Amino acid sequence: MNRTMLQGKLHRVKVTQADLNYEGSCAIDQDFLDASGILQYEAVDIYNVNNGQRFSTYAIAAERGSKIISVNGAAARCACEGDLLIICSYVQMSDEQAREWQPKVAYFEGDNQMKRVAKAVPVQVA
């Protein structure tokens, strides 16, 4: 049996641009892609913290160090400049591999300042 597991996550990045006329995708600072293990052209799911919208697109690289998060094409209708997003990619693996798997999670604050990168999502407590 295969399982679909979280591979990489950008937690609470801020949209810097929403460009309806660009041909689709989500442009992401190359440093952010590297930190999360998300590859250019990889499918990503995006969760908008501000409005609750959830949508899928693919990642493209933005200039390294630019702090750009640009939601493009039709997806630009789902996010506005300043919105906070969670961007995730997933991977399929065997049940055995999944039991040992740890995703790469990059956490952000302010104007896309990466504050830390972790190899797991913390346990939620009461």
Swiss-Prot record:
Cofactor binding remark: Binds 1 pyruvoyl group covalently per subunit.
One record GO biological process: alanine biosynthetic process
Pathway: Cofactor biosynthesis; (R)-pantothenate biosynthesis; beta-alanine from L-aspartate: step 1/1
Processing and modification events after translation: Is synthesized initially as an inactive proenzyme, which is activated by self-cleavage at a specific serine bond to produce a beta-subunit with a hydroxyl group at its C-terminus and an alpha-subunit with a pyruvoyl group at its N-terminus.
Keyword vocabulary terms for this entry: Autocatalytic cleavage, Cytoplasm, Decarboxylase, Lyase, Pantothenate biosynthesis, Pyruvate, Schiff base, Zymogen
Location in or out of the cell: Cytoplasm
EC category: lyase
Named cofactor requirement(s): pyruvate
Molecular function GO terms recorded: aspartate 1-decarboxylase activity
Pfam families: Asp_decarbox
Keyword Metal-binding listed: no
Entry function: Catalyzes the pyruvoyl-dependent decarboxylation of aspartate to produce beta-alanine.
Xref: HAMAP family: PanD
Assembly behavior: Heterooctamer of four alpha and four beta subunits.
Similarity comment text for this entry: Belongs to the PanD family.
Record-given protein name: Aspartate 1-decarboxylase
Native species: Erwinia tasmaniensis (strain DSM 17950 / CFBP 7177 / CIP 109463 / NCPPB 4357 / Et1/99)
